[in-house]
Structures are given as structure tokens and as C-alpha cells.
Amino acid sequence: MLTAAYRAEVASRNMKYQESEETNSAIKKMADALTTKSHKTGIVLCGTCGNGKTTLVRALQNLLIYLKYRNLTENGMPIMDAREVANRMRECKTVPLLAIEDMGKEPTTKLDYGNILNPVIEVLEHRYNEQLFTVISTNLTAKEIKEKYGTRIADRFNEMMSVIIFTGKSFRR
């Protein structure tokens, strides 16, 4: 079903689905992460630009809507750019399912009435503590995540996230 949702997402962008071993592997890994009984409470999709991470996140969102998981949140699973997470921090902490798109693009800190906040870190820590399912896409490597967000977040990622690394070439031409 996830493969069909991925193909439909590609078609919705007026693109032609290009079957590849890398894409099939990523879809299978995500399906396994979603259906295998595990202590993991999230999935992180890592890789360079344009190789299908966002398409897979949107395919999952559309599949959840199709399967009637709409009652969990307004649209199954909100997908928010990491910068939007910084602005909607309170909401992002509590939704049952959340996808954070392009983690790493946002400024690490934000000034709020004189207080320095680290919104993405705060959201991730809260979701970790509450064991709320989170899907993340990023162009950052594990080392870069550790440098930007700190050892604690990197360590929690290792515990809470199933990691899917996208190795394929960019589909954007």
C-alpha cells in the first residue's frame, strides 16, 4: 500500500515514477518500521536533496488519510517544515503524529519575549518523553545532527528513531 501511495504522490506532482532499488528499499524499510513491533517511536529519513524523502513522507500522510486515521489529527499527520515547528512549538509537542520536514534548515535558537528557546530540540524532547510518533526528513548526517542539536538529541534519535538512509541520486533535473 505504501508503494502505491508513493507512486500516487509522484503522479500528483505531474512526474513519472522512476522505479529504483534505492526507492524500493526505502519504501520497504519504512513499511517495516511502521508495522514491526518495536520500542521505536519515530522514523528519520536522511539523505541528500531530491531523492524522495519528502515524497515518502507525503505518501505516508496520504495513506493515513486513506486508511481513516484522520481522527488522530486534523489531516492524519501534519507535515511541518522545521521552521514552522519553531513557530508552532506548543501544537507540535502534542499532536499524536507529526512529520518534521527538512530538519536542520531552521535556526537552532529563537528569541521569545527575551527568552532564548531551542524549539525543535524542545519539541523532540517532549515527543520523546511522551513517546509520540514522529517522522523526520533531513539532509543532515548523524554527525551533523549531533553538532547542531547536541549529544543528548543524537543519542535519543538512536534510541527512538528507525533510520532510513536515502542513497539514490536526485530525481530533480
Task: Show the residue positions of the predicted features.
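Hydrophobic positions on the alpha1 helix immediately C-terminal to the Walker A/P-loop
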Residues: 56, 60
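AAA+/P-loop NTPase substrate/partner-engagement loops
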Residues: 62-106
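A short, basic N-terminal segment
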Residues: 1-39, 163-168, 172-173
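Short loop/turn elements that form and flank the Walker-type P-loop nucleotide-binding site
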Residues: 38-39, 92-94, 129-131
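Hydrophobic anchor at the beta1->P-loop junction of P-loop NTPases
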Residues: 45
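Walker A (P-loop) ATP-phosphate-binding motif of ABC ATPase nucleotide-binding domains
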Residues: 42
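Conserved glycine(s) of the Walker
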Residues: 50-53
